[in-house]
Amino acid sequence: MPRKGSVPKREVLPDPIYGSKVISKLINGIMLDGKKGVAQKIVYDALALINERTGEDALEVFEKAMNNIMPVLEVKARRVGGANYQVPVEVRSDRRQTLGIRWLVNYTRARGEKGMVEKLAKEIIDASNSTGATVKKKEDTHKMAEANKAFAHYRW
């Protein structure tokens, strides 16, 4: 813990094309080795592909996908009397968004298609339809929290 109070959170600037902070965070999540231009091209091309494939507004499809992959509950390890319990806790809104983007990027990279644009577009479309690996991760997280509901009284 810092001695001089808490460190202020840095505000993420909205992306130049869609004016969305969530898209900006997705770009930052996809970025490797500081190559933001490459990451922007991937995200914008993927959103254009989504627009073309679904016929819907890409930003709406992305927001629907994010709502389907952001977790409400998660488990945290809590040590009580020499035993570790998985205690279910609610996820803060900023962490929900961060986890959703992190899972989306990780499962996009793990997909089998050729090219990151194709992978990202398909993963976002799958997530908006409540299918795909990212949605499964959210459901698994919720199942884990549900299974450990008995330890909810250990919350801190």
From Swiss-Prot:
InterPro entries from the UniProt entry: Ribosomal_uS7 (IPR000235), Ribosomal_uS7_bac/org-type (IPR005717), Ribosomal_uS7_CS (IPR020606), Ribosomal_uS7_dom (IPR023798), Ribosomal_uS7_dom_sf (IPR036823)
Residue ranges of coiled coil: none
Signal peptide (from-to): none
Subunit structure: Part of the 30S ribosomal subunit. Contacts proteins S9 and S11.
Any one GO BP annotation for this protein: translation
Keyword rRNA-binding included in the entry's annotation: yes
Gene Ontology molecular function terms on file: rRNA binding; structural constituent of ribosome; tRNA binding
HAMAP family xrefs: Ribosomal_uS7_B (MF_00480_B)
SUPFAM superfamilies referenced in this protein's UniProt entry, alphabetically: Ribosomal protein S7
Superkingdom to which the source organism belongs: Bacteria
Name of the molecule in the record: Small ribosomal subunit protein uS7
GN (gene name): rpsG
